[in-house]
Curated annotation (Swiss-Prot):
The gene is psbI. One of its GO terms (cellular component) is plastid membrane. It is found in: Plastid membrane. It comes from Cuscuta reflexa. This is Photosystem II reaction center protein I. The keyword Amino-acid biosynthesis does not apply. The lineage of its organism: Eukaryota, Viridiplantae, Streptophyta, Embryophyta, Tracheophyta. It is a single-pass membrane protein.
Length: 36
């Protein structure tokens, strides 16, 4: 059970890192076509 929980936490952290990286890469301030 501990290995399964560790695997789940690893996958969650991995996807969160991808989400944060994608959000920073797609910063609205870097997109000239989007003004807010």
């Amino acid at each position: 059970m501990f290995t399964l929980k560790l695997f789940v936490y690893t996958v969650v952290i991995f996807f969160v890192s991808l989400f944060i990286f994608g959000f920073l890469s797609n910063d609205p301030r870097r997109n000239p076509g989007r003004e807010e």
